[in-house]
C-alpha cells in the first residue's frame, strides 16, 4: 500500500464551467478566498436554489482553482472557451491525482491508439490495478466509478470520451 491517498470527493458537476468562471472573476477583484466565498454566498452568484448546494459547489471550485497560478486564473477569466476548458481540466487533475493518473495511463494510451471509445471495462481495469496499491479505492462506490464514463445511447456499456465541456 502507498502512503499517499487519493482524494476521492468527486462531484457529479464535471468541470463546473460556468460556476468556475464566476468564482474566478469574483476572486480576481479581491484576491482573497475568504472574501470571495462570502460574496458568492451572500449574493448567490452561483444561482443555486439551496444554500447548501452553493456551499458544496463553491468549496469544490475553490479547492480546484487554488491549484492554479495567478496567471492561470487570469487566463481562465480572459481566455478562449478552449483555454478555459483546458485550465479547468488541469485544475481537476491537480486536485484529484487519481483523475490525473487515469488521464495519463488510460486516456493518453487510447488517444495514441486513436481509440476514442471509453468503456466501463477500461475504467474497471484501471481501478482494479490502482486498488492494489491504494486501499482507499477498495471501498469506492460504483457511482464514483461511473463519473469516468456515461452511457452511450448505442451501447449501455460504452461511452464517448468527454468533450471537455
Enumerate the predicted regions with their spans.
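Short, leucine-enriched amphipathic alpha-helices that occur as contiguous helical runs
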Residues: 20, 99-100, 120
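DNA-recognition alpha helix
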Residues: 119-133
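Short basic-aromatic helix/loop recognition motifs at nucleic-acid
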Residues: 112-119, 144
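Positively charged, low-complexity/disordered segments
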Residues: 155, 159-164
Amino acid at each position: 500500500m502507498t502512503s499517499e491517498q487519493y482524494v476521492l470527493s468527486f462531484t457529479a458537476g464535471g468541470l463546473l464551467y460556468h460556476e468556475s468562471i464566476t468564482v474566478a472573476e469574483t476572486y480576481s477583484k479581491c484576491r482573497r478566498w475568504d472574501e470571495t466565498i462570502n460574496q458568492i454566498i451572500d449574493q448567490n452568484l452561483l444561482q443555486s436554489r439551496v444554500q447548501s448546494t452553493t456551499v458544496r459547489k463553491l468549496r469544490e471550485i475553490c479547492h480546484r482553482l487554488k491549484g492554479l497560478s495567478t496567471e492561470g486564473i487570469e487566463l481562465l477569466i480572459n481566455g478562449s472557451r478552449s483555454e478555459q476548458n483546458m485550465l479547468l481540466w488541469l485544475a481537476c487533475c491537480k486536485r484529484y491525482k487519481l483523475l490525473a493518473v487515469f488521464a495519463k495511463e488510460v486516456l493518453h494510451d487510447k488517444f495514441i491508439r486513436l481509440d476514442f471509445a471509453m468503456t466501463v471495462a477500461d475504467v474497471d481495469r484501471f481501478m482494479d490495478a490502482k486498488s492494489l496499491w491504494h486501499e482507499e479505492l477498495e471501498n469506492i462506490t460504483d457511482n464514483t466509478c461511473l463519473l469516468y464514463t456515461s452511457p452511450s445511447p448505442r451501447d449501455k456499456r460504452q461511452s464517448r470520451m468527454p468533450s471537455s465541456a
